[in-house]
Structures are given as structure tokens and as C-alpha cells.
Amino acid sequence: MRIIATNKKAYTDYIIDETYEAGIVLVGTEVKSLREHGASFKDSFCRVKEGEIWLLNLHIPPYQHGNIYNHDPERPRKLLLHKKEIDRIWSKLKLEGYTVIPTKIYFNNQGKVKVEIAIAKGKKSYDKREEIKKKETQKRIKEYLKYNR
């Protein structure tokens, strides 16, 4: 498994509830561009539309050696999941405050591009501050134990 890009903001801004591995429908120049340049998750999210899941605002840069048939960098991309998984995601999305975000995009062992998506709930600012405080105290305890043995 070769990771192309990860969504680092997902773990700081959201509480991750469930994760799913999904295939993604791409054109040839997008795959070539992913191999060369990677992707950007800035403001990307998923939406369920007519029984299908679509990934929106995932930026895949244009392929440098492409011609006039190069892809649109911000186009909506269809995700491939089983119907039961889509229904489970849709039932969670009906609840207040839940959203579906991409967390990782990677090549699996067969060379196929996969996207890890997560059902997440947004964190409040005080939740983020509490998490930062916990990390700092854990770091201080670790340093204290390291130097005072």
C-alpha cells in the first residue's frame, strides 16, 4: 500500500466514528497525476446523491504531459461502495452533525486507487483545546519520567 495523501485536518477538526474503503472512478490522466504529484484534500467532502456517493472538491493537479483532453482538477468523482454500505452511511448522515470526509487516498497492492472515507462529527473549539491540553500533559509526564529515573 502506497499512501498518496492524507487529510491531517480530519483528525483535528472531526471526531471519527466509522471508516470505509472505497474505490474511485478516475480517468487516465488523473491516475498519472496522482503517481507524480499527489492530491489535496482542502475543503473536500462526500455527498450521497441518488443512491451514489460523490467525492467533491478533491484537487488532483492536471497531468503535465497531458494534452487538450486533460481532466478538470476539481471535478466531482464517484466513489464505489456496496449498496449496504451506502445505506448505512446515508442513515448516519440523517443524524444531526454528521458528515462524510475523505481521510486518505492510496494505491492498494494491486495498483488500484482507493479512498478511505470516514463518518465524522465536527469538534467544538473547546473540544480541540481539551485535546491539546491532554497531549501537552502527556508530553510533560513522558519528559519528566525520562529525565527523573
UniProtKB/Swiss-Prot annotation:
What molecular function does GO assign, one term?
A: RNA binding
InterPro entries in the cross-refs: SmpB, SsrA-bd_prot, SsrA-bd_prot_CS
Q: Does the keyword Cell cycle apply?
A: no
Major localisation: cytoplasm
**Where do transmembrane segments lie in this chain?**
none
Tagged with keyword Oxidoreductase: no
Described purpose of this protein according to its UniProt entry: Required for rescue of stalled ribosomes mediated by trans-translation. Binds to transfer-messenger RNA (tmRNA), required for stable association of tmRNA with ribosomes. tmRNA and SmpB together mimic tRNA shape, replacing the anticodon stem-loop with SmpB. tmRNA is encoded by the ssrA gene; the 2 termini fold to resemble tRNA(Ala) and it encodes a 'tag peptide', a short internal open reading frame. During trans-translation Ala-aminoacylated tmRNA acts like a tRNA, entering the A-site of stalled ribosomes, displacing the stalled mRNA.
Q: Which family does it belong to?
A: Belongs to the SmpB family.
What name does UniProt use for this protein?
Answer: SsrA-binding protein
Source species: Fervidobacterium nodosum (strain ATCC 35602 / DSM 5306 / Rt17-B1)
